[in-house]
Amino acid sequence: MLNHILLLVISLVCAALTLSWFPLLFRKQSYSCAKGLIVITGGSGILGHAIIQEALDRGFSVASLDSTEPASFLQYNSKFSALKCNITKDKDVEGCVHSLKKMNRTPFALINAAAIAPKNHLLSISRQELQKCFETNVIGQLAITSALFPLLLQDPNPHVVNIASSLAYFSAMGVGAYSSSKAALVSLHETLEEEVLSQHPNFKFSLYVLGQIKSTMFEKDTPNRVLAPLLEPQNLAKIIIQNLYTNKSGRFYYPFYARFMPLLRFFPLPIQKLARLFSGMDKIYS
C-alpha cells in the first residue's frame, strides 16, 4: 500500500513539473529541413490534407501514402507524389518503400496522420471493427515507421511525428475503441522514442495530443465550446510544419485543456464523474 501511495505522489510531482516546465520539453536546433521530403499517411483526411497543403506551401516535397486517391489539384504539383498504400497490409507498405527507393526519394520526416474512429459502445462493437481500428491507428503506424526507418536514418536529423488524442487519457462513451487505440499509440510512441534515441541520439520524435478537430471523423459538435473549442486543421498544420521546419520536437498539446487531461486520472472517481458531467463529453456519442 505504501508503495502505491509513493508511486502516486511521484507521478503527481512529475506531472506538476511537466506542466511547470512545459517549454523545456522541446528540443530545438538550428538545423533547417527546408526542401526535404515528408512522407505522410492519412493524407486524404481533413488534417492530413491540411498538412500536405501547408508543407507544399512551405517548399517541402510530399509523398502521401493513402488507400484513397488524393485531391485532383495536388496531382499537378511537381513536389507531390501519391502512393496508394493501405498501412494495415504488409505488401502495400513494402511496395511503397520500394517505390520511394526506386524514385531515389529519401525522406527526412514521417507524419502518421492516418486514423479511424468507430462510434459504438465497447460491448456492441464487432471484433472486426475493433481490430481494424487498432490495425490502422497503432499497428499500421508502427509498420510504416519500421519500414521507413532505414531511409529516415540516411538524413542527419530524421523526424517521426505521431498524432494522438486527449481521449487517450480520459475517454468518453461511444468512442472507446478510438480512445484505447490512441492510448496504445501514446505508449508506443514513448517506448519507441527511448529505444531509438538510445542508439540514434539525432533522431527526433514529436507527439501531438489533440482535442476535437473540425472534421468528418467527429462530425458532432463539442457540448462546451468554452472548455473544449474545436481545433482548425489549417492552424494545426501550420504548427506541425513550422516545428519540422525549425527542427523542433517534443510533446505538443492543443488546445490548452489537453495538457491537463492526464491529471484527471489521478483524481478520485467522484471528481472524474463531475468532470464528465460538467463537460458533457459522454453525451456526444452515447
Swiss-Prot record:
GO terms for molecular function: oxidoreductase activity. The active site is at residues 166, 178, 182. Keywords: Endoplasmic reticulum, Membrane, NADP, Oxidoreductase, Transmembrane, Transmembrane helix. Its EC number is 1.-.-.-. It is found in: Endoplasmic reticulum membrane. NADP(+) binds at residues 47, 67, 178, 182, 213, 215. One of its GO terms (cellular component) is endoplasmic reticulum. Coiled coil: none annotated. It comes from the Eukaryota. Its main location: endoplasmic reticulum. The chain crosses the membrane at residues 5-25, 36-56. It is a multi-pass membrane protein. It holds the Pfam family adh_short. SUPFAM superfamilies: NAD(P)-binding Rossmann-fold domains. PANTHER family: PKSB, RETINOL DEHYDROGENASE 10. Belongs to the short-chain dehydrogenases/reductases (SDR) family. This is Uncharacterized oxidoreductase C16H5.14c.
